[in-house]
Amino acid sequence: MSKPSQASQPLAVQPVYLAASAINSVIHALPAGTAYGIGVVLITMFTGQLVHHQGSLARAALPYVWQLRWGWHRVERAMERGKVVLDVLFDRAFTWCFECLPAEPVRLGSEQRTVHAIDSSTVVRLRANKKRCALLGKGYCQRAQRAVQANIVAALTTVVLIRGIRVGLVRRTRFGATCQEAVANVFAALPASPEKRLFCVDAGIATIEQFRIATEHDALVGRLRKNVTLRRSPAPKLSGKRGRPALHGPVVHPGVKRPEGRPDEDTTVRLEDREVRVRRWHNLHFRETPRTRIDVVRVDDPAYNRPLLMGTTARELTTAEIRIAYSHRWPVETNFYVAQGTCAMEMPRAWSATGVERRISLALLAGALLKTIAAACAPLPMGPWDLKAVSSAGRLANHLSLHAQNFATLALHGLTPRKYRKINIAKKPAELQLPLAA
């Protein structure tokens, strides 16, 4: 008696094919020699081998280029001298995610604004020579608890949903001597978009200057300092009263224990087993920018010692939407963690401006792609002990390292490394006059 056939199961998305397709589509527009080298770099980052070799690109790339003459040197040369425009790579990766993955942009408010997050990270370079290493600045190191010399990078991330999982797609990276300079460079290099946008930032980035340059098209929402001082709108000028109309109204300190006056909204929200008080003030402004109106939301949660202050220029958002918008800031920090732990962002091993910029930017790009591909695939357990596996970038990198050869073959499909040959030009001997015989 024949055994009954098993019920057909839905085919799962193969992460190896997705990751290989992502790399192939990103690098296919580059020149042939450069594309092969950059592809090998991305493969070492996707598989976590660059972290395993402590950031040594030559050792990590050697298994993929051993058959080539000067193989690892070609990879290093592509990173230092290849014709690569990072913004083009970011745009191609962004397009690939929407074409090949079930990605949907997060939208908020009646204006249906797309949500973007901006944050900065400090890549510590304690042993780097100041004269030799480029793009060095000063940044605070949490581990050392002091300011150290470092490469400071700021990243712009677009927040999307993939199968209900919130992830961030890196769109731009910029560097600077300080965090403020790097963030300002990111704001100056924003990609053009016909849709209205909402940028989520943290307290160090939500400065008065950033609120001032925010527009109706590109609004800003960010956390404010606890000691921030704001002004209410002035009372309307009475008819017949002499003098100019007032620019500022009463002073408001929304972060103190008892703010002045009454808020425009005062509600209580039930979260799990506790009640959270939420207050909102309309049409406030900084003393330095009286024409820039913002709404401020204060959240008093019993689980935290300090209140959470959020300000936004998108005043059409409801109080609940402002709280949701600020929570969308976390994907950009997740990209930094993935790039550090899986793609060796903290170990650039580069000293020129081009090398530092490409090593750190490609690590952020690889980390974001790992996170998005993992969200689109089924959970990948590390072993029989991993009973509660989740869709994470680290598990995906471990899976790709187990299939590294097949993954590299698919990722570099259609790309042929440039063949170098030594050109021997026979030099003609100089026709010198023979010396006269004695």
Regions inferred by a protein language model and the residue ranges of each:
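Short, conserved catalytic/metal-binding motifs centered on acidic residues
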Residues: 60-61, 111-126, 156, 196-205, ...
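Domain-level cores of phosphate- or acyl-group-handling catalytic modules
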Residues: 177-237
